[in-house]
């Protein structure tokens, strides 16, 4: 219907279409439209659609996706007020009262460039006002399955590419993730990551603006959290659990505030500052990057950490050793000349006590410099029980004798070495 309203001018005009619908071969479309105040239009729209993707693929002649099938149901209600003289203001307030419901059922397709088909994709997501909620996003790829749910507290801020911080939270889980199958370049290849995860769960949170996320020259700028991570690995026969992390990323620097977790019964705590991390991402880096780090653990069982693929990499007499009250502090500097040219690592604190051998590491530290396949060990010191030592060394690891720049040299100074202990 159409009415010019009580005032009989454009401010009171109303226009409405109710229950309009269409049934093309692709599916069913219906909706309602109501517009009032033609000077500053107040628009209410409801759209409901249910269509089949295989028809759309044929109709649009989509060649990059094969065997596309599935159903999509989309419901949209939105209310917007448009200022004709200042339309940019209405864009700023778009979706003040907005509702969208998306349901995808049994979506499947094959990308010619990838050897695995995506199948059984089911999605249910709702956007109400500014907040978006993903009830479920379930998919199967090859032997792997993935389930995602989550929330975005201000989706329009992302759509409009604003500088406002948006908080996103995701819960990701999987019964089985076959990383080798997923990362291999072809069906018969074994060039991918040879690992598989089972009973995996991961909680992630991000606090970043859409602008910082997409326009950062390096990694997305913002604060990122691992709320929880647990998994069982196929070739690393240990239970990873209670992982948590807080990472702050700036344009050129990043700060790992706290990274904690457990491997079976072993725990770890790590924090650090990374300056000019962008060097690691450049194809031909030039310059220096630095790391300052702390590592600590109440208990580390060596057999928990250094066993992989059925092989134990710890000497037999130390396989059941346990390090208690471990504390490490150090810093590293890496110099790049189109590639990594040299690495300098200094450990100024290393303390721990061994449970089986009844020894304590005290006052351990030193400097290690690696350059051109040459390793320089400078003032590496330590005290273990009644033994106290100081080591300096120059070692060459290059295989080309013509490029060898120095003879190997090791210096050991000890006030006492108690081999019995």
Regions found by a protein language model. Name each.
Residues 41, 70, 96, 164-166, ...:
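A short, structural micro-pattern
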Residues 7-8, 85-93, 159-163, 213-217, ...:
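Short loop/turn motifs that connect adjacent beta-strands in outer-membrane beta-barrel proteins
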Residues 95, 165-167, 217-218, 241, ...:
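Short "repeat-start/strand-capping" segments in structured domains, especially the N-termini
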Residues 60-64, 109, 188-192, 230-231, ...:
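Extracellular loop and loop/strand-boundary signature of outer-membrane beta-barrel proteins
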Residues 93-100, 166, 217-222, 341-343, ...:
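Short flexible loop/turn segments that cap and initiate beta-strands
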Residues 1-40, 48-58, 73-83, 97-157, ...:
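Hydrophobic lipid-interacting interfaces of membrane-associated proteins
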């Amino acid at each position: 219907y159409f009415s010019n309203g009580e005032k009989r001018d454009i401010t009171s005009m109303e226009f409405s279409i109710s229950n309009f619908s269409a049934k093309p071969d692709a599916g069913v479309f219906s909706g309602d439209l109501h517009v009032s105040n033609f000077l500053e239009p107040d628009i209410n729209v409801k759209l409901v659609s249910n269509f089949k993707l295989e028809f759309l693929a044929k109709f649009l002649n989509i060649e990059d996706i094969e065997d596309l099938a599935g159903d999509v149901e989309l419901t949209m209600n939105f209310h917007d007020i448009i200022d004709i003289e200042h339309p940019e203001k209405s864009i700023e307030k778009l979706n003040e009262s907005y509702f969208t419901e998306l349901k995808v059922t049994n979506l499947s397709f094959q990308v010619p460039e990838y050897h695995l088909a995506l199948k059984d994709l089911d999605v249910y997501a709702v956007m109400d006002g500014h907040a978006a909620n993903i009830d479920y996003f379930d998919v199967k790829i090859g032997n792997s399955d993935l389930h995602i749910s989550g929330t975005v507290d201000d989706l329009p801020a992302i759509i409009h590419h604003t500088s406002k911080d948006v908080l996103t939270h995701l819960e990701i889980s999987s019964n089985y993730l076959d990383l080798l199958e997923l990362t291999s370049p072809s069906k018969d290849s074994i060039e991918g990551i040879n690992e598989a995860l089972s009973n995996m769960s991961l909680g992630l949170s991000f606090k970043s603006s859409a602008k910082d996320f997409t326009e950062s020259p390096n990694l997305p700028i913002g604060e990122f959290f691992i709320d929880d991570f647990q998994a069982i690995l196929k070739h690393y026969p240990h239970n990873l659990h209670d992982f948590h992390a807080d990472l702050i990323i700036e344009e050129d620097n990043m700060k790992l505030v706290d990274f904690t977790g457990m491997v079976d019964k072993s725990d770890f705590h790590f924090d650090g500052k990374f300056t000019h991390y962008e060097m690691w991402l450049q194809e031909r880096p030039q310059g220096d990057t630095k790391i300052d780090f702390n590592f600590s653990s109440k208990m580390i069982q060596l057999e928990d950490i250094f066993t992989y693929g059925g092989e134990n990499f710890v000497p037999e007499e130390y396989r059941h050793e346990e390090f208690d009250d471990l504390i490490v502090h150090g810093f590293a500097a890496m110099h790049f000349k189109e590639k990594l040219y040299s690495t300098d690592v200094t450990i100024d604190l290393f303390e721990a006590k061994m449970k089986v051998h009844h020894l304590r590491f005290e006052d351990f530290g030193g400097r290690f410099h690696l350059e051109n396949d040459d390793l320089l060990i400078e003032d590496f010191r330590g005290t273990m029980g009644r033994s106290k030592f100081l080591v300096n060394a120059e070692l060459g690891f290059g295989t080309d004798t013509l490029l060898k720049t120095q003879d190997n040299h090791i210096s050991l100074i000890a006030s006492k070495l108690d081999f019995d202990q």
